[in-house]
């Protein structure tokens, strides 16, 4: 009964989020930042925030990202817990079936500061490309989850790590470069909160960043890695593990036969 109530609450929250995003995007057309986000940034993060300069800078960045097309919408606006998450670097896939990616005002403020940086190492812009690729991979692999307990958590972990590989590939970055950017821009600034995130398997459907970066060492989502993630989530059901491998394991690339 409690599980059914939780499902209903989640569906209601998703519906409310969809309504909010629909209204926000309708108000702003193809704009990339909500008025609420602008107000939050000026009040909490950067009083000198210049919206027009920000738009110009972001559009230049987006033109360099080849996996986005003319139908993709990048939208900076508060979401989820408005009191805690807005200054951090968080993202969400937005509406299922649409190429909308939602980012917190913290992203807008950090990228805005980058537009003034003369000798930047590009860590934040590379991380931005990786995160967009990660969220876009989520959209491509989207499927409803009708599971509970550890199996639901396990699928959450598999989705995140699979989308990490997708983000690395789409952004044309190495796992080493993404790791450097994460450690500088997120773990270095928000490490205490992020390092607690998902360390207890049953609490969160996300693994820790440390766990995710460890998985990247395989270079791709192998069947062995999928099986190990399942085991780390406490899954003993071998049929379930085999099913997850069929869904999430990348097929090895066959070498081309020599001509002649």
Can you annotate each of these PLM segments?
Residues 46-108, 125:
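Auxiliary, metal-adjacent structural segments of Zn-dependent hydrolase domains
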Residues 158-198, 230:
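Short helix/loop segments within enzyme catalytic domains
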Residues 135-153, 162, 169-175:
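Catalytic Zn2+-binding segment of zinc metalloproteases
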Residues 9-11, 193-260:
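Pan-zinc metallopeptidase signature
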Residues 30-45:
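Acidic/histidine-rich, surface-exposed loop or edge segments in extracytoplasmic proteins
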Residues 109-131:
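Short pre-active-site segment immediately N-terminal to the catalytic Zn-binding motif
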Residues 14-31:
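Membrane-interface motif at the C-terminal end of an N-terminal transmembrane signal
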Residues 1-14:
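N-terminal Sec-pathway targeting helices
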């Amino acid at each position: 009964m409690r599980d059914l109530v939780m499902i209903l609450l989640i569906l209601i929250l998703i519906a409310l989020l969809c309504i909010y995003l629909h209204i926000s995007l309708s108000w702003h057309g193809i704009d990339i930042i909500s008025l609420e986000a602008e107000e939050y940034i000026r009040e909490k993060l950067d009083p000198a925030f210049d919206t027009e300069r920000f738009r110009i800078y972001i559009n230049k960045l987006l033109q360099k990202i080849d996996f986005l097309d003319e139908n993709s919408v990048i939208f900076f606006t508060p979401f989820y817990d408005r009191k805690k998450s807005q200054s951090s670097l968080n993202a969400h896939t937005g509406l299922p079936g649409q190429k909308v990616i939602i980012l917190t005002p913290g992203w807008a403020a950090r990228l805005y500061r980058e537009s003034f940086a003369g000798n930047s190492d590009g860590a934040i812009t590379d991380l931005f490309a990786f995160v967009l690729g990660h969220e876009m991979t989520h959209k491509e692999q989207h499927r409803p989850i009708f599971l509970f307990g550890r199996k639901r958590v396990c699928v959450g972990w598999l989705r995140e790590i699979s989308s990490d590989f997708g983000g690395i590939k789409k952004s044309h970055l190495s796992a080493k470069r993404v790791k450097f950017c994460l450690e500088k821009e997120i773990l270095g600034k928000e490490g205490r909160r992020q390092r607690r995130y998902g360390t207890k398997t049953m609490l969160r459907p996300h693994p820790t960043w440390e766990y995710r970066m460890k998985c990247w060492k395989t270079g791709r989502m192998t069947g062995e890695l999928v099986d190990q993630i399942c085991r780390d989530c406490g899954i003993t059901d071998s049929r379930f593990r085999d099913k997850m491998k069929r869904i999430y394991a990348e097929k090895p690339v066959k070498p081309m036969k020599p001509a002649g």
